[in-house]
Amino acid sequence: MAGGAMVQTVGGKTYPGKMTAFVFFTCLVASSGGLIFGYDIGISGGVTSMDSFLSEFFPSVYAQAKASKDTNQYCKFDSQLLTLFTSSLYLAALATSFVAAWVTRVFGRKWSMFCGGVTFLAGSALNGAATDVMMLILGRILLGIGVGFANQSVPLYLSEMAPANLRGMLNIGFQLMTTIGILSANLINYATSSIEGGWGWRIGLGLAGVPALIITLGALVLPDTPNSLIARGYAGDAKRVLVKIRGTDDVHDEYDDMVAASEEAASIEHPWRNILHRKYRPQLTIAILIPCFQQLTGINVIMFYAPVLFLTIGFAGDASLMSAVITGLVNMFATVVSIISVDRLGRRVLFLQGGTQMFISQVVVGTLIALQFGVAGVGEMSRSYAILLVLFICMYVAGFAWSWGPLGWLVPSEVFALEIRSAGQSIAVCVNMMLTFVIGQAFLTMLCHLKFGLFYFFAGWMLVMTTFVALFLPETKGVPIEEMNHVWSRHWFWGSYVTAHDVAGAGAGGGGNRRSHNV
């Protein structure tokens, strides 16, 4: 495939190479790890809105859901056990992220992806065959282990395989696959909800094994990244892979920089302690705040509970599932916009535009719900009013899909120096999963108590995070990850933490961010 022939670095170097069919294929296969993440997000919200599923496992919630329209609509799905079914996955992923970091470092990126696929496959089988709530939650825990491995290894794999000038586009492949997984799950929910006998939810939960099988088999045929191979002592293999993915034999400079970076990283004995050093303060801040902010957009509760949310605000069963399909389509196509524009417009432009759009949409959605249901939560919507509400929810989803969705994974994966990279990525995944669990577990209760104010709550956070990006996030478009320290040293605020001495000390490779050699 055609691509950029030279990659310009901040430090003035150029690495020869182009976008090859081989690197595109490997990144496409690796990105399928996002399918397991996205499929679960979509399927869990759908099955928890199905009468047959609720009546079998959550009868008290089923009774509330069937209550009269004269009762408080905000609270009819409020159940900690029901939310635990959804959010237990992310608690398991949180705990797994530290083990996954070690596996990713010691055995390589591809085998971490393989572990994720196998455990997700086991979890999907258990959920599809579940006969009680404990089987459901145990299956969710296995799914969470799979997600923990995939989210640790796939973003690193994509960042390390991609040429610097196309890193954003290829890395966002993970988010695109996530949106495809969500859309596929929404379509399956819609198709299986009307199956006679009430066992359609088993199909939805069991079919999670399909994306798990794709990433499992894909991991077996993928090469590992040159960075990981060098770090594990396979220098010859690393150079052969680098030649193949760059489409040229002239990879000496890039290879030498990788080796130098690996040697410096190998000398670091305590990366978890070192990440607290002053010169890594910018990266540590990004590792914590970007995934934290990503969840505080409120997107995952929209995606988890889209059918439940639409039922809450007055949609019929089939209409709520179809509305979730519509938001899934918007999510997928808007992610394509991000793929096309991220390496042209840059990260900051997408963050700022998307954040502004999401803020406006959240305020409008909250206001529309307030006008219709008020504080009491009693009322019904006309068809035209419902269409208007879905329109603004779709605007919100689109804003997320070309900004905080893909960039929330891309930016943390590309900013770390090599010697702290695995520790940094683990922190990013850990924070993401922790906030996903907390917000997912609390959402239905928050909806019950905050009512329409919940959307204003998330809108307020949109203001905070958009301001943070405007002031404190430098542009990383087109910057090779070995040269990322230059970006921090030239920033108006972070330059006081990353000095010229730190940049010089990074040398050709020490400032790199392509590997997670040490945990």
UniProtKB/Swiss-Prot annotation:
Extracellular compartment segments: 40-80, 128, 189-202, 317-321, 379-386, 448-451
CDD domains with a match to the protein in the record: MFS_STP (cd17361)
Keyword Transmembrane helix: yes
Subcellular location: Membrane
Chain ranges on the Cytoplasmic side, renumbered to this chain: 1-18, 102-110, 150-167, 224-295, 343-357, 408-426, 473-519
UniProt cross-references to PANTHER family, sorted A to Z: SOLUTE CARRIER FAMILY 2, FACILITATED GLUCOSE TRANSPORTER, SUGAR TRANSPORT PROTEIN MST5
Protein name, entry field: Sugar transport protein MST5
Provenance organism: Oryza sativa subsp. japonica
